[in-house]
Amino acid sequence: VKISFLINNIYGIGGTNRTVINLAEALAVRHEVEIVSVFRRAASPKFVISPRITVRALVDLRPGSADRGAAGSKEPSEVVPRQEEFYAQYSRFTDERIIRELRRTDADVVVGTRPSLNLFVAAHTRDGALRVAQEHMTHLAIPPAVRAEMARVYPRLDAITTVTEADARSFQENTPIPGVPVVGIPNSVPEPVVQPSDCTHKIVVSAGRMHRIKRYDLLIRAFAELAEEFPDWQLRIYGDGGEAGKLRALVTELGLNGRALLMGGFSPIESEWAKGSIAAVTSSAESFGMTLVEAMRCGLPVVSTDCPVGPREILRDGEDGFLVPNGEVEGIAWGLRRLMADEPLRRAMGEAALRNAARYDPAAVADRYMKLFEDAARRRAAAVRGYRAPSGPRKAAAGTATVPPAGIGATTVDVTADGAGRLHFRADGPAEGRHRRQFVLRHRPSDGNRRPDLPLPTSREQLDNGGTRYTATLGPAALDELGDGRWQVTMRSPKSAPVHMKAGLRDTRALIDVRERVVGRPPSGPTTWNLPYAQPNGRLMLRTVLREEHAECTAIEIGEGVLTVQGVLCGSRTVEPGALFVVSRRGQHGRNFAAPVQLLDRRTFRAEVPLRRVVDHRLERWEDWDWWLQPDPDDWRKTRVCHLLEDFPDVKGAYAYPSLPLVGDEDSEYSVSHPVRPVWVRPYCSASGAMAMNVVDR
């Protein structure tokens, strides 16, 4: 059977793209599958797609393409209703391309994936193909004018699917389509490669786009209610979007800086779910609830609002999580408290979540779709003379929906940190042949002084699908060669240039425990740290840390004109009575100010820095003041205060500290040429991990 999925833009990101790819890859084990994207705006899809699946685009909108500005591209679509969400993207030109594709397709089944495309599928797909509409949006969220057009055109369909049973009922009640079955089939989520969470790390995880419908404000407020009761717990929210600024302001307002972290986008997300012990979903509406299933497949119990329509069909309340009232901070806090206070309950519910989420495996969901197609074919054969249901030979089962990548550059590398200073690399690549490929680390210097490449001893294993599995381990001893820096993770053979590899899973959860040990018992020797991370272009990098001595920042508080810093000294020295915390103005007009240090023990310190001294001695409108610790008043040597030891790369973004306004002093060195105005002081962590603060005259 040949199955064709028609999608808006497979080259972008989004829940529909991800679920269509999951289903397509499961169907591709036994059938011929293609994904036809209306638009193409990038060289390659953001999500990895199995080479089994053919990917084509109808309209190429990349710079320089002939389709940009083509005849008819400025004229409105005659098929897509004006009220449809993506109406502005469509035109008479796109109408022509889509209709031509549907009339010429040789697919046995054509599946549309949003209302605009389903209208095309219903009205223009050739008669010999089954027409199926996937509805990923909650039915009543579709504008009434679009639903009216669906009611007019959808009777030509053979089947309609929604992602929940509740939405299937809503569809039938509000937009009945005589003679066309509406079936609830959930989205699928593959079993993660990452090991499930053991529910011991005191982290609440949430993930999704930063949009008001996700109601992260409720989650942050609920966590704030519990912050004093559970001082060692942390909230991590992953995602990008327009609400991030408001949420940062709320974190500051509630005094949760360093406790509630906005982590930004992260892919693949499975390794971040597995770091947590509780997943939280606080949306006001969810058409399905992919994040619930993703978290459950990683072994997390879920606290979710009982919002329409997905969560109540996914969660088994009291067994693998808690459903709490929609829109209520108190209910969310109640659910979180139940799990934060009871580790055995977390573990039991996490194990139940792992079992219960198996019903969303792509193979199981693909079987339901095949039954839907077969039932539709029987109905069509009974009603339409001359129609022949597809009955060609199926592909031989390969046991898995994956095949080797077409080239080494398309291969992703998974990395696991084991907590003992080792990183384990794994990549499933193309057939090895005579290449003798191996992992090689290439230095990416900040000063132009590049160090020699470091080849890693690499093992190779032939896979059943004809590909090759490459594995290597980087041990702590290698840091003597790597030193402090950033390294590209590449693969090369004796006869080929290095290829910078794509980042897959980065399972760094073991580093959470390592940081806790280091902060609790700072090392008396050098500090080492290996952290894999992905560049914005998706390529895999390694951040290596080798410091003979540094002060690791563990807490920052900003009060009325006072900055309070707490940290531990790592290295051979100890913090002596009379030690000083030093702030130093960067640049050619350097100046130092020192504050006394309070000793909490021989390696742990606390300092209170009066910010007025810095503000009143500024010389420029924008200044940076670096932080140092002088552990011994009789030894002039200072050591840098840093925030290096985390399990994620963007410390600066996650720990976004607020700005404190101070009024400039009329007698300051700077007020001679500028009148008194507010001066803002903000601590930050630089990209190198060094702590500093901005002093800005606005």
Protein language model regions, located:
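Basic, ligand-binding patches in group-transfer machinery
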Residues: 382-698
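Conserved acidic donor-binding segment of nucleotide-sugar-dependent glycosyltransferases
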Residues: 316-318, 322-329, 338-343
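A short, well-ordered alpha-helix in the C-terminal region of glycosyltransferases
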Residues: 331, 338, 345-359, 368-371
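Aromatic "clamp/platform" in nucleotide-sugar-dependent glycosyltransferases that forms part
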Residues: 265, 284
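Donor nucleotide-sugar binding/catalytic pocket of nucleotide-sugar-dependent glycosyltransferases
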Residues: 133, 140, 155-193
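N-terminal strand-loop element at the rim of the active site
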Residues: 7-13, 26, 30-86
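A conserved mid-protein helix/loop that constitutes part of the nucleotide-sugar donor-binding site
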Residues: 17-22, 202, 206-228, 242-249, ...
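Short hydrophobic beta-strand element within catalytic cores of glycosyltransferases
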Residues: 301-305
